[in-house]
C-alpha cells in the first residue's frame, strides 16, 4: 500500500511537468507561426509590387492560423487586379487606339461595352472594400503582428481603394463622351468625309455640333489619365 501511494505521489508531478511542456510547446508553435508570418509580410508582401503572391503549401503550414489573415489581403488584391485588367485596361487600350476621327466610330462599341460594365465594377469594388474592412476590424492580433499587418493592409487595400474611387467615375464620363462622338459621326453617313487625318461636314451646323461634342474631351482625357496613373501607382 505504501509503495502504491509513493508511486502515486511521484507520478502526479511528472504529469504536471508533461502538461507544462506540452502547453509551452503549443505556445511556442503559435509564436513561431506568427514570427514567420510577420517576416513574410515585411519582406515579401510589402515588396510584392502589383500582385500579392499566392501562398505555397509550405507557407500555409508555416503560418498556420494566420493564413486566414492573409486571405483578407489576398482576396481584395485579386479584386483590384481583376478590375484593372478586365474593367479599366480595355478603356485605356480603346482610348489609345483613337488617333484619327474615323477611330471614334471603330472604338465606340468597345467603349460602349466598357462604359456599361463600369457601374457594376464600382459596386463590386465597394462591396469588396466593405468586406475587407469588416474582416480586418474583427481580427484579434498580437501587439507585434498588428502594426505590421495594418501597414500592409494600408498598402494593399486602403491606398488602392482611395485611388480607384475617382478613377471609375472619370472613366464613365470620358467613355460616354467618346461614344457620343462616334455615334454622331456614324449618324451622318456618307455626308462625312475624312481628309488628311481630319473630318469635314457639308454644313456649318454639323461641324458646330461635332465641335461641341469633342470640346470636353481634352479635359476629360486629362482627368482620366491622372486618375489612371494614380491608380496604377497605388497598386504597385
Q: Model segments located where?
A:
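Extended amphipathic alpha-helical interaction segments
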Residues: 100, 108-200
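Sec-dependent bacterial lipoprotein signal peptides
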Residues: 1-26
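Register-specific recognition of a single heptad position within extended alpha-helical repeats
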Residues: 57, 64, 98, 105, ...
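Amphipathic alpha-helical coiled-coil segments
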Residues: 70-73, 77-80, 118, 125, ...
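Leucine-rich amphipathic alpha-helices with coiled-coil/heptad-repeat character
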Residues: 84, 91, 132, 136-139, ...
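Leu/Val/Ala/Ile-rich N-terminal alpha-helices, chiefly Sec-type signal peptides and the beginnings
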Residues: 26-108
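A cross-kingdom marker for long, charged
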Residues: 191-236
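Extended, non-membrane alpha-helical segments enriched in charged/polar residues
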Residues: 68, 75, 176, 180-183, ...
Amino acid at each position: 500500500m505504501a509503495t502504491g501511494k509513493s508511486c502515486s505521489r511521484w507520478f502526479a508531478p511528472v504529469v504536471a511537468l508533461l502538461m507544462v511542456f506540452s502547453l509551452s510547446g503549443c505556445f511556442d508553435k503559435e509564436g513561431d507561426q506568427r514570427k514567420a508570418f510577420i517576416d513574410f509580410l515585411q519582406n515579401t508582401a510589402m515588396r510584392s509590387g502589383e500582385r500579392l503572391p499566392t501562398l505555397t503549401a509550405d507557407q500555409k503550414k508555416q503560418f498556420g492560423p494566420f493564413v486566414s489573415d492573409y486571405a483578407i489581403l489576398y482576396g481584395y488584391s485579386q479584386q483590384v487586379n481583376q478590375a484593372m485588367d478586365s474593367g479599366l485596361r480595355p478603356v485605356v487600350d480603346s482610348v489609345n487606339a483613337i488617333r484619327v476621327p474615323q477611330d471614334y466610330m471603330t472604338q465606340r462599341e468597345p467603349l460602349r461595352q466598357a462604359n456599361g460594365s463600369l457601374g457594376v465594377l464600382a459596386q463590386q469594388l465597394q462591396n469588396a472594400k466593405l468586406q475587407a474592412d469588416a474582416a480586418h476590424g474583427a481580427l484579434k492580433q498580437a501587439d507585434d503582428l498588428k502594426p505590421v499587418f495594418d501597414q500592409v493592409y494600408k498598402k494593399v487595400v486602403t491606398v488602392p481603394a482611395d485611388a480607384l474611387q475617382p478613377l471609375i467615375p472619370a472613366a464613365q464620363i470620358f467613355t460616354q463622351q467618346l461614344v457620343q462622338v462616334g455615334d454622331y459621326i456614324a449618324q451622318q453617313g456618307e455626308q462625312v468625309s475624312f481628309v488628311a487625318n481630319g473630318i469635314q461636314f457639308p454644313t456649318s451646323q454639323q461641324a458646330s455640333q461635332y465641335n461641341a461634342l469633342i470640346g470636353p474631351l481634352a479635359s476629360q482625357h486629362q482627368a482620366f489619365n491622372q486618375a489612371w496613373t494614380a491608380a496604377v501607382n497605388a497598386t504597385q
